[in-house]
Amino acid sequence: MSDYVYDLMKKHHSVRQFKDKALSDETVQKLVEAGQSASTSSYLQTYSIIGVDDPEIKKQLKEVSGQPYVVDNGYLFVFVLDYYRHNLINENVDFDMQTSFESAEGLLVGAIDVALVSENVALAAEDMGYGIVYLGSLRNDVARVKEILDLPEYAFPLFGMAVGEPADDENGAPKPRLPFEHVFHKNVYNSNAKEQREAIQKYDEEISEYYKERTNGKRQETWSQQVAGFLSGKTRLDMLEELNKSGLMKK
């Protein structure tokens, strides 16, 4: 791997302020084709990408997300876990395919495919000089997003991605990640609780200092506090129901 690719990856951060400049159709096609080049489980290609440039549709999706950059961006992508085309194939063969794509394994395969595609899109966009931000907030109301985008059965919106030229006053920066030694386990998983707690405590101190410097002391939250606050929120507990309504996760 060249230093250029490594450095590009290491510089990644979410961009939430964009210039009012739309991506060209040529750029959109290049990004999607870069996404399609990602690895896909068993060549199933269990994904679709909805490109949104209609201001009214963006506005409706913003009402779901609550984020202004759903509208204010160069282009909006919505990444969809998609077994609809596979179901069409199923209608014309003598095999039972539905059991597979309605299963938990089918959900995992689809979600992984979508994630790999989206990261290719993100990396290609950043290589072109654009900024990106993922939009998991579109899952705030999955039923509404499916309605807005006219998604058929077996098609499920996982997340969006806003892409565009970063605004001149955009001042985002990469957040410190967990240390290498804390996420890389050699041969077997290191479940030593004492070592894990010590590593978390050290990382908490680093993150608290990071926020303190970025906000002139207004924020000193630790990573543990941030994680606890998010995971105790009990949000989107209807997700299994919504997956089932889309024909997924039934087995």
Swiss-Prot record:
Class in the EC hierarchy, top level: oxidoreductase
InterPro entries (UniProt xref): Flavin_OxRdtase_Frp, Nitroreductase, Nitroreductase-like
Cofactor(s) required, per the database record: FMN
SUPFAM superfamilies, sorted: FMN-dependent nitroreductase-like (SSF55469)
GO terms assigned for molecular function: oxidoreductase activity
Pfam families hit by this protein: Nitroreductase
EC number in record: 1.6.-.-
Signal peptide, first to last residue: none
Reported function: Reduces FMN, organic nitro compounds and disulfide DTNB. Involved in maintenance of the cellular redox state and the disulfide stress response.
Family from the record: Belongs to the flavin oxidoreductase frp family.
Record's protein name: NADPH-dependent oxidoreductase
Organism listed in the record: Staphylococcus haemolyticus (strain JCSC1435)
Biological classification of the source: Bacteria, Bacillati, Bacillota, Bacilli, Bacillales
